[in-house]
């Protein structure tokens, strides 16, 4: 069977050259006579893999020396707890900006650790936009401020990163890390689950300023303390070694594409193909405020559930799969991460045009 175009929000499409290299090295990695999946994480071979992955990420994101790159487990969802356990250490209070389902879940976990202030929210607009933060961060005594740079479910993203004076800015970048350029120095902590733009599920990346490490309460569990990973080069216990290995190959592929600046231009072009059609369509609509449209996750719908279901079924027959929208939003959603080729997006648009002609 030929490969399909997979528009899944995560786990998501991986670059075909990456999969082919993994396939080639799967049984016998680098002449060792064993697979990465069988290899000791204490071996020199794996040490070089995790070191190279960290170096590549630093290079691609231009990460300053005062930041640590940590390879973690538990998904971004575990970070919802780790962050307050490690950073709510002075005022026992944090600020959260609500822009979607995931930021709301992050807030709910933080409330179990300390006091949470909702700085701004677009919930009244059904999370179809990004709220303004002007003047809301005056002299607040907060341990950190948390944002979600791209909202996977709702299809919105920050156009400008808010300036937070004297308070660490924490960002969930799970669905748009490495898809566009960010100034890492604006953040105290960046975290992301790997399974959208970095690699396979099982790995979480944290990029954290060194002066934010070491402040966890003494009752903080060892495995939830950033210091544990910092002191042990992310090798305190067995890491998700295969996921780290595949992520390294994805980062190599990304570098070959010209790095983040080149991939950002590709992503703008790909998303424009779909948005331009949606703006002209008489059948399909996008619920998102055009100012804050995501480059990665694009929700859209037709006037009826029946048409939505028909669209999804016929799309699947054409090899355009996993287009069903999240249950909280409905309709359809095309996730067009870094690895999605422009041809895949064009195939989707061509099909949407045909479907509209059939259902005028």
Curated annotation (Swiss-Prot):
Keywords noted in UniProt: Amino-acid biosynthesis, Aminotransferase, Cytoplasm, Pyridoxal phosphate, Serine biosynthesis, Transferase
Residues that hold pyridoxal 5'-phosphate according to the record: 76-77, 102, 152, 172, 195, 237-238
Catalytic activity from the UniProt record: O-phospho-L-serine + 2-oxoglutarate = 3-phosphooxypyruvate + L-glutamate; 4-(phosphooxy)-L-threonine + 2-oxoglutarate = (R)-3-hydroxy-2-oxo-4-phosphooxybutanoate + L-glutamate
Keyword Transferase attached: yes
Annotated compartments: Cytoplasm
Name used for this protein in its record: Phosphoserine aminotransferase
Cofactor entry: pyridoxal 5'-phosphate
Similarity comment: Belongs to the class-V pyridoxal-phosphate-dependent aminotransferase family. SerC subfamily.
InterPro entries: Aminotrans_V_dom, Aminotrans_V_PyrdxlP_BS, Pser_aminoTfrase, PyrdxlP-dep_Trfase, PyrdxlP-dep_Trfase_major, PyrdxlP-dep_Trfase_small
Assembly notes: Homodimer.
GO cellular component terms attached to this protein's record: cytoplasm
Gene Ontology BP term (one): L-serine biosynthetic process
Annotated positions of the N6-(pyridoxal phosphate)lysine modification: 196
SUPFAM superfamilies registered for this protein in UniProt: PLP-dependent transferases
Organism per entry: Bacillus thuringiensis subsp. konkukian (strain 97-27)
Residues reported in the UniProt entry to bind L-glutamate: 42
A GO molecular function held by the record: pyridoxal phosphate binding
């Amino acid at each position: 069977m030929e490969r399909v175009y997979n528009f899944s929000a995560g786990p998501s499409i991986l670059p075909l050259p990456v999969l082919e290299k993994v396939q080639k090295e799967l049984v016998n990695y680098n002449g060792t006579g064993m697979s990465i999946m069988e290899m000791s994480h204490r071996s020199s071979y794996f040490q070089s893999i995790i070191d190279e992955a960290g170096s590549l990420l630093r290079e691609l994101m231009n990460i300053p020396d005062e930041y640590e790159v940590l390879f973690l487990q538990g998904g971004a969802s575990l970070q919802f707890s780790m962050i307050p356990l490690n950073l709510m250490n002075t005022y026992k209070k944090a600020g959260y900006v609500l822009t979607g389902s995931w930021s709301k879940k992050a807030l709910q976990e933080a409330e179990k650790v300390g006091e949470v202030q909702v700085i701004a929210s677009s919930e009244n607009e059904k999370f179809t936009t990004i709220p303004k933060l002007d003047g809301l961060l005056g002299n607040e005594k907060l341990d950190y401020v948390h944002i979600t740079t791209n909202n996977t479910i709702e299809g919105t993203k920050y156009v400008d990163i808010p300036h937070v004076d004297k308070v660490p800015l924490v960002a969930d970048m799970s669905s748009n890390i490495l898809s566009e350029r960010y100034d890492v120095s604006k953040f105290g902590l960046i975290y992301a689950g790997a399974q959208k733009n970095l690699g396979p599920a099982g790995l979480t990346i944290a990029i954290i300023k060194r002066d934010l490490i070491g402040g966890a309460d003494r009752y903080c569990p060892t495995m939830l303390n950033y210091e544990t990973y910092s002191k042990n080069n992310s090798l305190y216990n067995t890491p998700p070694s295969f996921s780290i290995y595949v992520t390294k190959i994805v980062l190599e592929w990304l570098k070959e594409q010209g790095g983040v600046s080149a991939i950002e231009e590709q992503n703008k072009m790909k998303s424009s193909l779909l948005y331009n059609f949606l703006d002209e369509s008489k059948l399909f609509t996008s619920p998102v405020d055009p100012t804050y449209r995501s480059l990665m996750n694009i929700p859209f719908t037709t006037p009826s559930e029946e048409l939505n279901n028909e669209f999804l079924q016929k799309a699947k027959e054409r090899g355009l799969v996993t287009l069903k929208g999240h249950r909280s939003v409905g309709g359809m959603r095309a996730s067009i991460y870094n690895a999605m080729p422009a041809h895949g997006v064009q195939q989707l648009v061509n099909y949407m045009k045909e479907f509209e002609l059939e259902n005028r």
